[in-house]
Amino acid sequence: MESKMRKIGRISILIALFALFFACGEKGVTGKMKSAGKTENHEKIDPFLEANKIIVRREAEEIELFIKRYQWTMKETGSGLRIEILDVGEGDFFKEGDEVTLNFQLFLLDGEVVYDSKNDGKKVFVVDKSSEITGLHEAVKLLKPGGKANLVIPSHLAYGVAGDGHRIIGQKSVAMKISIEK
């Protein structure tokens, strides 16, 4: 499964490089200045759009396959976060500025556990005020103290194009099991 994921990643990179190569090609220097606010040549943008559409479609397919494999019953938010609330918790919902402590397990969509609170310690962060991934902030605001949930976080809400610089490469969706302390 790991080699399949790497192959998909390599294909995505090749598509992006192909699009970049053709998007940057110029037929000749005209000496004319172009306005930064106007798009005069739509042909230069189309390869980027097409490459991005392919990448987004493949990522969505991977997410759906993962959800089916684990038989999670998920709801999708407007941003693309998928969440299965196992226990909403008690008290007030978390909001911006609240401190959260949670146990977690973070893994790739091939099932490989990347980080977990048993080995890496609990996550302690302030909602919407820390460098935790955007998808986790969004999910926590749907829960209360003591809440538990399964999450599938698309790459744009996780570690983005660059990855985390350690164990997660760029453009990878991640899944999390979280349990918030009371």
Predicted segments, located by residue:
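Sec-dependent signal peptide hydrophobic core
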Residues: 9-16
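Cross-family detector of peptidyl-prolyl cis-trans isomerase
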Residues: 2, 6-9, 24-182
